[in-house]
């Protein structure tokens, strides 16, 4: 144990000794010097860049020069830390300028050294030595500039502090220097070690040699980067330090007289002619300046003497004085301001270890404030308990106190006769500065009695006593001068004042250094009394001067020249701190010398109001040309900051809002009145705590914040001014007059007298006066200057208030009868205040109504009936108790208590009995009422019967309506039952005859009972209509029946029910039926809708008739019984039964000579199904064709003209070959002039986009309408040039991928009808919004077109159709000789056309090189064909050119083609019926409904049966069951064609269409030539995103093709080859189109252009240069 104890003691002592030694070593001067030396060596890290650069180049001379320059530069920086003149000399602007110029010169010479070395010849060695010198100076100057580039004075301050505190300064300097040297050596060794290790490895060395040393570009890049970074950092450092330009010094004492003399000379007055007041002012200024001990004149003499003793550095660089102060602390009691030569921090004494030591403390202001607080603070300073010295000292004090206490106690025990008195030392003060008379300080303020840490506040002197002291102590120099110059001075010699000896006790004063000049602000310059200076020296906030009063605009007013008037009208300076207003006017003296000598200049008598904008102004109070580096660090967090804060006090500031971004809160305050209160909580809680004064302060604060917010943002004043003016005009001219008119109309309707004249008289009293932004009113029609930018207020005098009736009231005084207008049209009492509450218009009316209603007691009955009937027993008991309640005011307190106790007991008993009775009462008793309650209810019902009559009437009316509805429903059910029975009777009568039974089945038009009928007939899809029609046609054959029924003899034996049935469906018509038929009432609008079909009206107008169509449908359903019975007679079958019917009956007899046309059949049957009723049922008339009786069906021209489902699947088609008289059938009864096409049934999928041509040309509205003259030829005549057309156009056709339609049901027999799935729900096939998403420029044109369309009439296009010629030609071409002759002619024509093609193509290439080859071929072919054929037959030439451009004939068979081919046939049939075929064609191809790959290719010149047999055409062609139908040619959707079309658009001015005299006379549809070629550029046509997508997709996908198909053949390979040829031929043109018109000089700008990131702010960065095209085409 002892050993362990000894070990612990030894270890503890060793630890204490070692820790003390280590602490001494660490706190020693040597360690501190080593620490700061290493810091100075390693702090400047950027200076080693050039050293590493020299080491890498492996040149020993360069390496040595770099190291020496680095060490010398570091040494200079180290010495500048310890020597203040050197430190400031390196920071002076002049030294920086010299060093930077030398550095730039060295770099410039070093960079151009290699280029100029060859020209020197023999002086090459000296040049190389100069290169070494450049490297040395580079490293040296960079070290000296490093403190300026990266300024940080922390290290220098810390070193200065330690030098000030330590005693052994030389030891500190030596240790720091040695540490710096060791640090430099370590840095150099580390650099050599890293570079040497890398050089030893061959791989690293080879890489360095390959990419760095041998690569000259690397050094050039490094030099450029280093030079640019150095230049930027140098400019940044110049922003922190003053410019090295001599600033203009301010005027001092010697220049005051010169300034005055110059001004007097300008005014034409000699120096002798000065007034006495000016001399006094100058002498006063001179005396005040001469009295300053540190004025510049005296300092110059003293400095000349001291300059000899100062060092050379201090001579060159004056580091103690600058030309300008940063802040100018003004003092109005002195002429010049005090110079603040103290630094930001200073040294003060603080207690440390019980001793006062000098420490590095806080600023001076805080130390002075701390002294003032500590003098009166009562908190005791507790000593440091860890300090042993202070602990021992306190213990000694306690021991001494204990001894004294013990001694006193012992002395008290001694019995001594002497009375001891307690002697106390007290503090006393002299009475009235008399040392003989003293008085004690009060005990509460005496520190000797009450203890330490107490003080006494010094009593201030009275005001009169202060004035007496000031008169005695003030110097009487001016009074003595007056007495000396006065002749009557002898009268004062006997004055007793001379005999008195006035002793002036000079107080202890410190001579404060002052500036030798007086600086003024801009406001002082304006308000200067006389001779204002040329310019102000102190910056002020930017102010806006507003003219308040201009006397020139008021000529009737007298000019106010008197001083009294001037002083009354415009004061010198009035400032309103709340509104930041300053009213200023330049003052003039009474005895101005200019008034006597010179002419009177025009005085500016305008009264101005200066307003300061709420903006961050950190330059406020700064002196011009002062050094900004003296500014302390500031922190700016908010968007708008009026006052800056230091980092020390920034977090302690009061946060105004909950948001860090205060601009959002200010924006909220602009538009929402009273929103500033809602920043920290609810208004209710805050308003309860606030007093009236606090509320007023809060309101003023809010108003100031709103005003500042309006003035902070840009363009807010413009917005606010416009809103105020518009609100003023709306209020005065529109709103209030309209309200007055409405009020008086209401009064007239209520049979009261109108008050129109009185209201308008009161409205005329309301005047709107424009005011300045601060509320200064101007004239009624006079707006302030620049009111849009500087702001405006509108003041309303005697505002108008609308009342239900006018009452005479006392008028308010003019001081109260006004308000200000807000941007929302409301009224406020103050500017930017809360809107005041206006008296409600209905309030007096409602109060009067309330008083009248209270007298009537209308609601008494309803109040009694609140409780349900089941609780009537409880209610009765409570009512009985309520009658016995005592009145509290009739009894005393004792009686009240007794009554309360009795009442509580009674209530308890009653409640118990009620609960028991409630259990016993049954449901029957609950429903029954007592006699008493029934009497009450009867009485109340009788009393309230009169006001309740209106309610009863309404109730009875509702019951009546319900009764009628039920009756109608019952009658409808009865009608249905009767109809069913009648249908059964008809079925029984028809069952005898099998034929009649078939007829009954076939004409079953009734819908499924479960299916709901369509409410809008105009929106029915054609697929659904044709589905019902196909069922109707498949049920019977009308061929034999119509001829029987139309005979009057046989029709007698037919039952009248059957006659009515067939007559209703339009199959027969008799005179008896005509008499018996009920004429349906059709209104005029319905007839108008028939005449004007849906396709002729605007879609906007068409859908507005939806409600009328609904009513029309209801009226149809509510027809007479007979029509309902006849209509519903065939309603027993369902749609499910129709699915099971045999489709074989659809095929008609093949031996029939003539069949109906597809469009003819669909029009008739669809009209019979949907629009069966007519205004006048007409007899059966013949169709335009020469048809038989069995096909005679009524026809209506304006029926639905859609051609989609005109032909069923298995119906035979008439071959029209060789019969030209029926060529016109599809075009006669078609409505070509239809203006609109409903896109509701077309499915557009925008997911798969297709590049198509422009849907609507921009210049379509300005086209002139002309006519074409076409002739329709026979198919055989047109087939001879089909081959030529197809050969030229088929290259642009590409196969498409067929998409399997999942909507169709393969098992359904009628799947061909619903091939698009149009009758399914719209949720499965949503129709997209066809608002031309790719071309937003056309939306407005589309809407205009809907309202007022511009459509070409078909008569203009087909005006001269010569069908007789065609018939004569067919009759003449019966023989074979004529056929052979025509063949030879056509062959010769084709050969001539080919020869002319080659010639014209060569000519076209020379004329227009920018045209594409495909375009030239197409144009020249049309020219040749028209020129050749115009000689024979010009109309035939027009037809052929038209057919080549727009038509192609597709071979269609019925049994051989697959389903995909039949789909194409259906779509193409629809396209033939449409005028605007492009849109439907594109949509069908987009949805992959139309497959262009299956179109047959016919490579023959003439199609005959012999030729068909030779090429192996199937037998179905021999049977003459082939139909050649035209459809619009679609050109491939690839991007190449789109580029071709866009190029064609851009080259419209170069295209020359062939014309001749006949075509000019007949007229051709042409487009106006657009001279503005910029509109054809894709950037101008397309939207911003779409044009970017278009270019990128075309560039990426122009070589991609979709040739995959289930039915792909070897033809796809041919198509690819031909497309490749087109691509090679048009490659130059496409590249020209893809390449933009403007190229950018760098890649970043190119990326910014393609990805649309160049907005307005970045557009200035772009460098755009227009180039010529790549080639000349």
Curated annotation (Swiss-Prot):
Bilayer-crossing regions: 32-52, 70-90, 93-113, 130-150, 170-190, 218-238
Keywords assigned by UniProt, alphabetized: Chloroplast, Membrane, Plastid, Plastid inner membrane, Protein transport, Transmembrane, Transmembrane helix, Transport
A GO cellular component entry from the record: chloroplast inner membrane
InterPro entries associated with the record: TIC214
GO terms classed as biological process: protein transport
Chain intervals with Low complexity compositional bias: 1370-1379
Annotated compartments: Plastid, Chloroplast inner membrane
Record protein name field: Protein TIC 214
Gene designation: TIC214
């Amino acid at each position: 144990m002892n050993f362990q104890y000894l070990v612990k003691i030894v270890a503890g002592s060793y630890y204490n000794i070692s820790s003390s030694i280590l602490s001494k070593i660490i706190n020693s001067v040597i360690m501190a010097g080593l620490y700061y030396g290493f810091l100075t060596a390693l702090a400047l890290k950027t200076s080693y860049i050039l050293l590493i650069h020299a080491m890498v180049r492996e040149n020993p001379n360069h390496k040595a020069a770099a190291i020496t320059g680095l060490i010398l530069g570091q040494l200079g920086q180290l010495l500048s830390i310890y020597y203040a003149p050197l430190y400031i000399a390196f920071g002076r602007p002049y030294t920086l300028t010299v060093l930077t110029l030398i550095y730039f010169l060295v770099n410039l010479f070093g960079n151009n050294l290699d280029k100029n070395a060859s020209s020197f010849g023999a002086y090459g060695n000296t040049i190389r030595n100069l290169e070494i010198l450049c490297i040395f100076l580079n490293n040296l100057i960079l070290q000296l500039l490093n403190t300026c580039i990266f300024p940080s004075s922390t290290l220098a301050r810390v070193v200065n502090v330690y030098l000030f505190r330590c005693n052994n300064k030389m030891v500190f300097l030596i240790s720091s220097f040695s540490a710096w040297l060791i640090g430099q050596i370590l840095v150099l060794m580390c650099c050599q070690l890293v570079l040497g290790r890398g050089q030893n490895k061959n791989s690293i060395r080879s890489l360095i040699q390959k990419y760095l040393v041998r690569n000259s570009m690397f050094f050039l890049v490094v030099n450029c980067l280093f030079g640019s970074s150095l230049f930027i950092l140098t400019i940044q450092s110049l922003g922190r330090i003053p410019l090295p330009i001599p600033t203009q010094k301010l005027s001092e004492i010697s220049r005051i007289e010169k300034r005055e003399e110059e001004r007097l000379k300008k005014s034409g007055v000699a120096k002798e002619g000065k007034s006495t007041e000016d001399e006094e002012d100058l002498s006063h200024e001179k005396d005040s300046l001469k009295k300053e001990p540190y004025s510049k004149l005296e300092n110059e003499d003293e400095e000349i003497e001291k300059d000899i003793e100062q060092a050379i550095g201090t001579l060159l660089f004056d580091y103690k004085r600058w030309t300008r102060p940063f802040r100018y602390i003004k003092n109005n009691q002195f002429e010049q301001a005090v110079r603040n030569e103290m630094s930001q921090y200073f040294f003060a004494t603080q207690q440390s270890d019980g001793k006062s030591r000098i420490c590095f403390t806080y600023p001076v202001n805080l130390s002075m404030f701390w002294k003032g607080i500590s003098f009166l603070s009562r908190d005791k300073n507790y000593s440091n308990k860890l300090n042993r010295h202070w602990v021992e000292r306190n213990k000694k004090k306690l021991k001494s106190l204990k001894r004294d206490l013990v001694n006193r106690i012992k002395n008290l025990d001694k019995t001594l006769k002497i009375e001891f008195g307690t002697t106390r030392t007290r503090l006393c003060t002299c009475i009235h500065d008399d040392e003989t008379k003293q008085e004690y300080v009060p005990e509460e303020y005496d520190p000797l009695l009450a203890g330490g840490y107490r003080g006494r506040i010094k009593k201030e002197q009275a005001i009169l006593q202060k004035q007496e002291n000031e008169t005695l102590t003030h110097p009487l120099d001016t009074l003595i001068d007056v007495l000396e110059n006065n002749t009557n001075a002898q009268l004062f010699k006997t004055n007793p004042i001379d005999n008195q000896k006035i002793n002036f006790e000079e107080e202890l004063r410190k001579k404060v250094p002052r500036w030798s000049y007086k600086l003024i602000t801009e406001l002082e310059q304006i308000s200067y009394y006389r001779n204002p200076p040329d310019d102000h020296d102190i910056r002020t906030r930017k102010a806006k001067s507003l003219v308040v009063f201009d006397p020139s605009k008021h000529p009737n007013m007298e000019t106010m020249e008197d001083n009294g008037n001037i002083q009354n009208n415009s004061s010198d300076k009035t400032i309103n701190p709340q509104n930041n207003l300053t009213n200023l006017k330049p003052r003039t003296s009474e005895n101005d010398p200019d008034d006597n000598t010179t002419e009177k200049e025009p005085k500016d008598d305008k009264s101005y109001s200066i307003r300061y904008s709420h903006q961050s102004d950190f330059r406020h109070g700064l002196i011009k040309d002062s050094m900004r580096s003296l500014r302390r660090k500031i922190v700016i967090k908010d968007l708008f900051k009026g006052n800056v804060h230091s980092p020390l006090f920034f977090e302690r500031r009061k946060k105004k809002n909950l948001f860090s971004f205060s601009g959002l809160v200010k924006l909220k305050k602009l538009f929402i009145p009273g929103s500033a209160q809602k920043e920290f909580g609810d208004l209710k809680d805050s308003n309860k705590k606030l007093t009236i004064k606090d509320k007023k302060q809060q309101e003023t604060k809010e108003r100031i914040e709103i005003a500042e917010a309006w003035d902070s943002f840009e363009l807010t004043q413009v917005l606010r001014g416009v809103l105020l003016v518009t609100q003023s005009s709306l209020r005065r001219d529109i709103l209030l007059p309209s309200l007055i008119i409405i009020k008086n109309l209401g009064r007239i309707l209520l049979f009261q007298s109108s008050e129109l004249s009185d209201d308008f008289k009161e409205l005329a009293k309301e005047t709107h006066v424009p005011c300045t932004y601060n509320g200064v009113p101007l004239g009624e029609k006079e707006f302030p200057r620049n009111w849009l930018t500087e702001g405006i207020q509108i003041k309303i005098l005697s505002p108008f208030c609308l009342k239900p009736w006018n009452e005479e009231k006392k008028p308010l005084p003019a001081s109260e009868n006004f308000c200000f207008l807000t941007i929302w049209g409301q009224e406020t009492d103050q500017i930017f205040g809360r809107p005041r509450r206006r008296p409600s218009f209905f309030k007096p009316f409602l109060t009067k109504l309330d008083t009248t209603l209270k007298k009537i007691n209308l609601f008494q009955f309803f109040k009694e009936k609140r409780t349900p009937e089941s609780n009537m027993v409880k209610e009765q008991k409570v009512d009985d108790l309520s009658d016995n309640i005592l009145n509290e005011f009739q009894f005393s307190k004792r009686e009240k208590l007794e009554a309360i106790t009795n009442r509580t007991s009674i209530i308890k008993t009653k409640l118990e009995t009620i609960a028991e009775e409630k259990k016993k009462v049954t449901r029957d008793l609950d429903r029954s009422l007592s006699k008493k309650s029934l009497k009450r209810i009867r009485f109340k019902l009788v009393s309230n019967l009169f006001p309740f009559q209106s309610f009863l009437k309404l109730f009875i009316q509702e019951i009546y309506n319900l009764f009628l509805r039920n009756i109608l429903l019952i009658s409808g059910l009865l009608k249905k039952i009767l109809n069913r029975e009648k249908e059964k009777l008809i079925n029984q009568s028809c069952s005898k005859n099998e034929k009649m039974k078939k007829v009954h089945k076939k004409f079953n038009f009734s819908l499924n009972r479960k299916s709901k009928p369509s409410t809008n007939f105009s929106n029915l899809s054609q697929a659904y209509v044709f589905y019902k029609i196909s069922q109707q046609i498949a049920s019977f054959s009308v061929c034999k029946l119509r001829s029987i029924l139309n005979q009057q003899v046989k029709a007698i034996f037919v039952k009248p029910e059957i006659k009515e049935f067939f007559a209703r469906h339009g199959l027969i018509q008799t005179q008896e039926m005509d008499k018996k038929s009920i004429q349906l009432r059709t209104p005029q609008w319905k007839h108008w809708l028939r005449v004007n079909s849906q396709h002729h009206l605007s879609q906007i107008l068409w859908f507005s008739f939806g409600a009328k169509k609904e009513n029309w449908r209801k009226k149809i359903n509510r027809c007479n019984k007979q029509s309902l019975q006849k209509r519903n007679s065939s309603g027993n079958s369902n749609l499910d039964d129709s699915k099971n019917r045999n489709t074989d009956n659809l095929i008609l007899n093949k031996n029939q000579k003539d069949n109906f046309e597809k469009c003819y059949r669909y029009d008739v049957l669809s009209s019979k199904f949907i629009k069966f009723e007519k205004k006048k049922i007409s007899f059966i008339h013949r169709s335009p064709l020469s048809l038989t009786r069995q096909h005679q069906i009524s026809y209506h021209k304006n029926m639905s003209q859609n051609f989609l489902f005109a032909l069923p699947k298995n119906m035979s088609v008439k071959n029209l070959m060789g019969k030209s008289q029926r060529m016109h059938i599809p075009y006669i009864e078609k409505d070509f002039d239809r203006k609109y096409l409903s896109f509701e049934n077309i499915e557009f999928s925008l997911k798969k986009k297709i590049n198509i041509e422009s849907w609507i040309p921009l210049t379509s509205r300005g086209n002139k309408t002309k006519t074409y003259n076409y002739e329709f030829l026979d198919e055989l005549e047109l087939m001879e040039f089909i081959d030529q057309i197809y050969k030229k156009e088929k290259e642009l056709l590409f196969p498409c991928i067929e998409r399997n339609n999942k909507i169709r049901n393969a098992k359904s027999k009628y799947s061909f009808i619903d091939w698009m799935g149009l009758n399914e729900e719209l949720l499965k096939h949503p129709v997209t919004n066809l608002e031309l998403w790719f071309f937003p420029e056309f939306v407005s044109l589309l809407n205009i077109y809907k309202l007022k369309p511009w459509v070409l009439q078909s008569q203009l296009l087909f005006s001269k159709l010569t069908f007789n010629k065609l018939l004569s030609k067919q009759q003449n071409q019966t023989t074979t000789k004529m056929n052979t002759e025509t063949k030879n002619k056509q062959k010769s024509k084709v050969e001539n056309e080919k020869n002319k093609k080659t010639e014209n193509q060569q000519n076209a290439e020379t004329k227009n090189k920018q045209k594409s080859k495909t375009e030239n071929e197409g144009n020249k072919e049309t020219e040749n064909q028209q020129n050749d054929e115009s000689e024979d037959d010009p109309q035939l030439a027009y037809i052929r050119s038209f057919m080549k451009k727009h038509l192609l004939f597709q071979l269609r068979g019925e049994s051989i083609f697959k389903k995909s081919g039949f789909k194409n046939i259906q779509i193409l049939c629809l396209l033939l019926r449409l005028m605007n075929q492009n849109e439907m064609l594109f949509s069908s191809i987009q949805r992959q409904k139309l497959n262009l790959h299956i179109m047959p290719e016919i490579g023959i010149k003439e199609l005959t049966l012999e030729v068909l047999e030779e090429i192996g055409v199937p037998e179905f062609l021999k049977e003459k069951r082939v139909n050649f139908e035209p459809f619009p040619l679609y050109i491939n959707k690839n991007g190449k064609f789109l580029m071709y079309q866009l190029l064609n658009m851009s080259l419209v001015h170069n295209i020359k269409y062939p014309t001749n005299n006949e075509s000019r006379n007949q007229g051709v549809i042409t487009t106006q030539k657009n001279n503005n070629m910029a509109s054809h550029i894709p950037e101008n046509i397309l939207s911003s995103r779409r044009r970017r997508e278009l270019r990128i997709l075309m560039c990426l996908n122009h070589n991609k093709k979709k040739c995959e198909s289930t039915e792909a053949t070897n033809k796809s390979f041919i198509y690819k080859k031909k497309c490749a040829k087109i691509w090679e031929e048009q490659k130059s043109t496409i590249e020209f189109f893809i390449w933009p018109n403007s190229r950018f000089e760098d890649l970043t700008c190119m990326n910014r252009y393609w990805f649309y990131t160049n907005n307005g702010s970045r557009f200035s960065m772009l460098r755009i240069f227009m180039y010529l095209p790549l080639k000349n085409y």
